[in-house]
Amino acid sequence: MMVTLVLKYVLVIVMTLILRVLYDSICCYFLTPRRIKKFMERQGITGPKPRLLTGNIIDISKMLSHSASNDCSSIHHNIVPRLLPHYVSWSKQYGKRFIMWNGTEPRLCLTETEMIKELLTKHNPVTGKSWLQQQGTKGFIGRGLLMANGEAWHHQRHMAAPAFTRDRLKGYAKHMVECTKMMAERLRKEVGEEVEIGEEMRRLTADIISRTEFGSSCDKGKELFSLLTVLQRLCAQATRHLCFPGSRFLPSKYNREIKSLKTEVERLLMEIIDSRKDSVEIGRSSSYGDDLLGLLLNQMDSNKNNLNVQMIMDECKTFFFTGHETTSLLLTWTLMLLAHNPTWQDNVRDEVRQVCGQDGVPSVEQLSSLTSLNKVINESLRLYPPATLLPRMAFEDIKLGDLIIPKGLSIWIPVLAIHHSNELWGEDANEFNPERFTTRSFASSRHFMPFAAGPRNCIGQTFAMMEAKIILAMLVSKFSFAISENYRHAPIVVLTIKPKYGVQLVLKPLDL
């Protein structure tokens, strides 16, 4: 009798849980999207008709396959139709504001800069990353700062901020100079030969972030870089299937490989962490070090910020990805632009030698005087921003300009389209013209957002800009760059904007 009663209770609990999951799934995949769609239609905002479960993903995929199927016929920068063909098509059909569907997740496209400013500043506390975004990167960078929301984001931002103080940045500069010198010496041996500069920049920035994040464990940091590069690609591919309920639990090829690589990445991180902890425990070292990992371990040891090992690993993965990926691409595209615009290359070289001397090694204090270089970097970030879009989800109903944004609606800010807008930048918006950052003072405007904007802007942007200036100043003073005849201009998007075939340059060492 008692056994029967227990079984009945268990059955009731199980059925209740099943019904709860079923109800939540129906709300998530059908009722909430339908409610948001009707709510926005009443405000006059429509968009392409979504398919069941997949939304507009198939349509976007077809457009991207067509637009990026061929290389560019020449080196030009009118890349919005190539990388955002769906934006170009639907903005013409539905206007500046339209709703598109990433599976069952509705996304409002927004390009009006005043509203974007309001969203990223005033409404920052009640917006953030969506569930789909978090799931798409969970296997890659976990719950680090990049994907955190609300109190978790504030907590992690506060935790990471000491790593980017002015004094710490000065300390990082020596690693940047040292690593660049070693690379330059190696490149000097390849006189007149073609160099895939993108691969060189990936190695260089991975070396720098390994030293600044892991210090004496930088060799393992380089191994970690290789694993994270593969893991990033797999997660980007697996994200396409997240619109299907339960897809992340299926034993698919992508899911198995992601799980295996994630385990290997975290094993390697644990080795680095355990090595630091052992050194302190046996008295070989008096602290965990002054790099990012040491800073986090010191906070955990002193019971600050409620840190645990998993949080430290997620932050390490996050900063490793953001700390080398975006900067290596910035350097790659900037060197391509300088090689394609020799007059600006000469201007920057003359400025570097005048400010920094013949060896071209800048001090941190001299970087602000490299105005031509700064303009070139900003123009590179405008034409080829690290990411094509900036997403935010509303966690409660908000008033944005003349719109009411309902809870659960994601807002999709097409950064690339804004950076290339003739309306905002003039008729030469698709041309390389660094002078625009002098005459029009756009560097600090709401039209320019390579590192996002508002309280949630990129915490490492000062680090990235310092690194880019040091590396470019040293390289341009030691080499001249020319585009190789083998270079094929074909930008693509794999989370970030990348050159499909790399960037082949011919380097010529300069006699000093």
UniProtKB/Swiss-Prot annotation:
Enzyme Commission code: 1.14.13.-
User: InterPro entries attached here?
Assistant: Cyt_P450 (IPR001128), Cyt_P450_E_grp-I (IPR002401), Cyt_P450_sf (IPR036396), Cytochrome_P450_Monooxygen (IPR050665)
Q: What induces the gene encoding this protein?
A: By trans-zeatin, cis-zeatin and isopentenyladenine in roots. Down-regulated by auxin and abscisic acid in roots.
Q: Which GO terms describe its cellular component?
A: membrane; plasmodesma
- Keywords from the UniProt entry: Heme, Iron, Membrane, Metal-binding, Monooxygenase, NADP, Oxidoreductase, Transmembrane, Transmembrane helix
Locate the residues binding heme. Answer: 458
Catalytic activity, reaction form: N(6)-(dimethylallyl)adenosine 5'-phosphate + NADPH + O2 + H(+) = 9-ribosyl-trans-zeatin 5'-phosphate + NADP(+) + H2O; N(6)-(dimethylallyl)adenosine 5'-diphosphate + NADPH + O2 + H(+) = 9-ribosyl-trans-zeatin 5'-diphosphate + NADP(+) + H2O; N(6)-(dimethylallyl)adenosine 5'-triphosphate + NADPH + O2 + H(+) = 9-ribosyl-trans-zeatin 5'-triphosphate + NADP(+) + H2O
What's the protein's topology in the membrane?
A: Single-pass membrane protein
User: Iron as a keyword?
Assistant: yes
**Record-level GO BP terms:** trans-zeatin biosynthetic process
Task: Give the transmembrane ranges.
Answer: 2-22
Q: Does the keyword Aminoacyl-tRNA synthetase apply?
A: no
Compartments it resides in: Membrane
**Cofactor section:** heme
Q: In which tissues is it expressed?
A: Specifically expressed in roots.
Annotated Gene Ontology MF terms?
Answer: heme binding; iron ion binding; monooxygenase activity; oxidoreductase activity, acting on paired donors, with incorporation or reduction of molecular oxygen
Biological role stated in the UniProt entry? Cytokinin hydroxylase that catalyzes the biosynthesis of trans-zeatin via the isopentenyladenine riboside 5'-monophosphate (iPRMP)-dependent pathway. Can use isopentenyladenosine-5'-monophosphate, isopentenyladenosine-5'-diphosphate and isopentenyladenosine-5'-triphosphate as substrate.
Instruction: Family membership, please give it.
Output: Belongs to the cytochrome P450 family.
UniProt-recorded name of the protein: Cytokinin hydroxylase
